[in-house]
Curated annotation (Swiss-Prot):
CDD domains in UniProt: trans_reg_C
GO biological process, one term: regulation of DNA-templated transcription
Name of the protein this chain belongs to: Transcriptional activator protein PfeR
Regions recorded as binding DNA: 200-301
Name of the gene this protein is made from: pfeR
Main location: cytoplasm
Single GO molecular function: transcription cis-regulatory region binding
Residue(s) carrying 4-aspartylphosphate: D128
């Protein structure tokens, strides 16, 4: 296919996608060998429902999309809810995640997606925004009133204000279209690491010096309860799951306090102060909550007994 100057003038982005050689050469070069696949250039509007993948899978050649190491994910057969109205993209993503061992439930509109989320517990939701009927943002708000399942929004609306709107509605991640499968895998793996702790039995969460009690929403050190509030417990559990990693305030507000972050809101700082004080009372010295300037908070484990 030849890129028309008029298409470039309209500001349409040009994406590279893997297509059969029969789509036509981009320039007058010798014809490729039969059954050979090569890169060709394709023009599509920013909001086009097709072409969301920067690279389309080739039967028998999918190893080029699965070269990311996924062995660190500890959740066996993660349960994924995919809500996407584009049939071709929905089919490609369904096949891709099934090859990775996911159990996938697919829906073509927001209403059916909401019904599926109410029937079954999922580890991750991939959600398109521009859906027929109930749109993705409305579906996201409904999910957040009932559950804290990680949700990744997928949309051709990639402007800053669109991303901010998605995060303020409760999204855990926002992936603009077009995207590559490699980036999609990396982002889904990161979200699944956040739910890893919830899938472990209490006996496997034991620290040799600190015990997390999910039922009491408290921690015990040497048999002494710290007397944490539910918000303080969620904050410590989240920091402990991501020990050594600086977590941003917007993420902690959404994950722990279940509300959006504003610069004038000091609620998280108050919880951190109270948490430090309560841990000190029960002599927890091997965990330190550090403030990282311009980023958020970090949990550091030391060698103190």
């Amino acid at each position: 296919m030849i890129v028309q100057p008029s298409a470039v003038a309209k500001g349409w982005p040009i994406a590279t996608t893997l297509l059969p050689a029969s789509c036509g050469p981009a320039d007058p070069k010798p014809e490729p060998k039969p059954k050979q696949r090569r890169l060709c250039r394709k023009v599509f509007p920013l909001r086009a429902r097709c072409g969301a993948l920067a690279h389309c899978p080739i039967p028998g050649k999918n190893e080029i999309f699965t070269n990311v190491n996924h062995s660190h994910i500890s959740i066996p057969s993660p349960r994924l809810l995919l809500v996407e109205d584009d049939p071709r993209l929905r089919e490609d993503l369904d096949a891709h995640f099934r090859r990775r061992g996911f159990r996938v439930t697919v829906c073509g509109d927001g209403s059916h997606g909401l019904e599926a989320a109410g029937r079954e517990a999922f580890d991750l939701v991939l959600l398109d925004i521009m859906l027929p009927g109930l749109d993705g943002l409305a579906l996201l708000e409904s999910l957040r009133r009932e559950q804290a399942t990680p949700v990744m929004l997928m949309s051709a609306l990639g402007a800053e204000q669109d991303r901010i709107s998605g995060f303020t509605r409760g999204a855990d991640d926002y992936l603009p279209k077009p995207f590559s499968l490699a980036e999609l895998d990396a982002r889904t793996d990161a979200l699944l690491r956040r739910v890893r702790l919830d899938r472990l039995p209490l006996a496997q969460r034991r620290d040799t010096r600190l015990v997390f009690d999910d039922q009491a929403q408290d921690v015990l050190h040497q048999g002494l309860p710290a007397g944490l509030t539910p918000s303080e417990y969620r904050l410590l559990a989240t920091l402990r799951e991501h020990a050594g990693e600086a977590l941003s305030k917007p993420f902690l507000y959404r994950s722990v306090l279940h509300r959006s972050y504003t610069r004038l809101d000091r609620g998280l700082d108050v919880h951190v102060c109270n948490l430090r004080r309560k841990l000190a009372v029960v002599a927890v010295r091997h965990l330190q909550i550090q403030a990282v300037r311009g980023q958020g908070y970090l949990l550091v484990e030391t060698e103190h007994p």
